[in-house]
Swiss-Prot record:
It comes from the Bacteria. The Tat system comprises two distinct complexes: a TatABC complex, containing multiple copies of TatA, TatB and TatC subunits, and a separate TatA complex, containing only TatA subunits. Substrates initially bind to the TatABC complex, which probably triggers association of the separate TatA complex to form the active translocon. InterPro entries: TatA/B/E, TatA/E. Pfam families: TatA_B_E. One of its GO terms (cellular component) is TAT protein transport complex. Belongs to the TatA/E family. Its main location: membrane. It is a single-pass membrane protein. Keywords: Cell inner membrane, Cell membrane, Membrane, Protein transport, Translocation, Transmembrane, Transmembrane helix, Transport. It is found in: Cell inner membrane. This is Sec-independent protein translocase protein TatA. PANTHER family: SEC-INDEPENDENT PROTEIN TRANSLOCASE PROTEIN TATA. The keyword Protein transport applies.
């Protein structure tokens, strides 16, 4: 009926085991698992790094906004010539 039955999958699995052997398949599975684990670790470390950078950027913006010194103009008025005499 067009689909692959369980018996066909078992026959394919048996042929693969006979061709490659269990040791080769075990090492291949371990390598594949290690690759998937490494990929997940890389993705999570990239997300952590991006979150850390976003937090630092937000903190620096907040610090810059609150730490802006207010400049007060303290102009010294020149003394007039009349007062000096």
């Amino acid at each position: 009926m067009g689909g692959i039955s369980i018996w066909q999958l078992l026959i394919i699995a048996l042929i693969v085991v006979l061709l490659f052997g269990t040791k080769k398949l075990r090492s291949l599975g371990g390598d594949l698992g290690g690759a998937v684990k490494g990929f997940k670790n890389a993705m999570s470390s990239d997300e952590d790094k991006k979150a850390l950078e976003d937090a630092e950027a937000a903190k620096s913006v907040q610090t810059a906004q609150t730490a802006q010194p207010t400049q007060q103009a303290t102009e010294k008025k020149p003394e007039s010539n009349k007062e000096q005499a």
